[in-house]
Amino acid sequence: MIINQLPETYNIFAPIIDIMPVIPILFLLLAFVWQAAVGFR
């Protein structure tokens, strides 16, 4: 019964799993922009 419910749960979290690899890149870009903004002052 639990195994039959897994696909439904996966469909709910699928978008989050697709976005997860992009999050570290966004953090790197945010850190780079922040350092650039502080450096330009």
From Swiss-Prot:
Main location: plastid
InterPro entries per record: PSII_PsbK, PSII_PsbK_sf
GO cellular component, one term: photosystem II reaction center
The UniProt record lists the keyword Thylakoid: yes
Keywords in alphabetical order: Chloroplast, Membrane, Photosynthesis, Photosystem II, Plastid, Reaction center, Thylakoid, Transmembrane, Transmembrane helix
Subunit structure: PSII is composed of 1 copy each of membrane proteins PsbA, PsbB, PsbC, PsbD, PsbE, PsbF, PsbH, PsbI, PsbJ, PsbK, PsbL, PsbM, PsbT, PsbY, PsbZ, Psb30/Ycf12, at least 3 peripheral proteins of the oxygen-evolving complex and a large number of cofactors. It forms dimeric complexes.
Primary role: One of the components of the core complex of photosystem II (PSII). PSII is a light-driven water:plastoquinone oxidoreductase that uses light energy to abstract electrons from H(2)O, generating O(2) and a proton gradient subsequently used for ATP formation. It consists of a core antenna complex that captures photons, and an electron transfer chain that converts photonic excitation into a charge separation.
UniProt-recorded name of the protein: Photosystem II reaction center protein K
Organism this protein belongs to: Cyanidium caldarium (Red alga)
